[in-house]
Amino acid sequence: MISLNRKEINKYVIFSFVAVLSLGCFHQRKPTKLKLDFNNSLILSGESHFKNMSQLTFSGENAEAYFSADGRKLIYQAHDGDSLCDQIYIMDIESKSVELVSTGAGVTTCSFFKYPNDNGIIYSSTHMDNPDCPPKPDFSRGYIWKLYPGFNIFEAGLGGSSPRPLTSSPGYDAEATYSFDGKKIIYTSLVSGDLELWSMNPDGSGKQQLTNRLGYDGGAFYSYDASKIVWRAYYPETEEEIADYKSLLAENSIRPMALQIWTMNADGTNKEQITNNNSANFGPFYFPNGGKIIFSSNMHDPKGRDFDL
């Protein structure tokens, strides 16, 4: 999934470490008791919703971490060093042991456990198109997100064995997550010529386009009962916005923008806009009962640097 790089952008400030907060793993059926070394000095004064906090990573850039179904592991992307590309890792939360589960080639993003049994993983990678680490984006037009056209979605065994492509179309395919019953995958694809949300079966069959509006649709997650989808979107409206969006898209890039939170039914019907501001709204996720959504936003910071949940 597209994420903000702290070393390449100073407009936004996000956490540079992965933290486990005792808000509970939203998708778990039963609470998982983990033995962790909590460092509650990391909790800022005035934070009333955090009970305990444990820092899990201490070097490099670590992003987009997601819990396994049993709540005992995390899958995430990371690299350590400016010249290296992100690869996918699984961490045992208690022991802090880390295992590389992607191929080590190309660049990767957007990993997720195969629910409901943790018997595999999915992630996006360019290794099938080109095993080399691609060059860093050109920021001469400002800060942009790169949509590497070699990105395809792969499934693999839990330890990364036997990776198999679920997509093979030209252009960007990434930002994939499973429904919690394991019956569907939702992802972002450029196959139609625009960045739209698609769903498919776990074996890659039954691909269905769910959105069809000019702009970026991405970062989607199913509700716990798999009946709803929540995602982030940007739809350019003015002639200038549309021209800028199309120009960058032709170069396999998009610019950070005022992303808004949307929901819809799992079949793509009943689309509803949840936020309506000029801020950046990220990472929407349903509560277990489906009645609330948690997300990250800089709506309360006039400078746009500070994100809160």
Language-model regions, residue ranges each:
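Bacterial N-terminal signal peptides that target proteins for export
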Residues: 2-13
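Short loop/turn segments that connect beta-strands within beta-propeller blades
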Residues: 92-96, 157-161, 201-205, 265-269
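Residue-level detector of Asp-centered blade-edge/turn motifs that repeat once per structural unit
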Residues: 69-70, 115-117, 180-181, 224-225, ...
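C-terminal motif of bacterial Sec signal peptides marking the signal peptidase cleavage site
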Residues: 23-24
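Blade/loop signatures of beta-propeller domains
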Residues: 31-51, 147, 151
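A flexible loop/linker signature enriched in serine peptidases of the S9 family
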Residues: 58-61, 78-88, 103-108, 124-153, ...
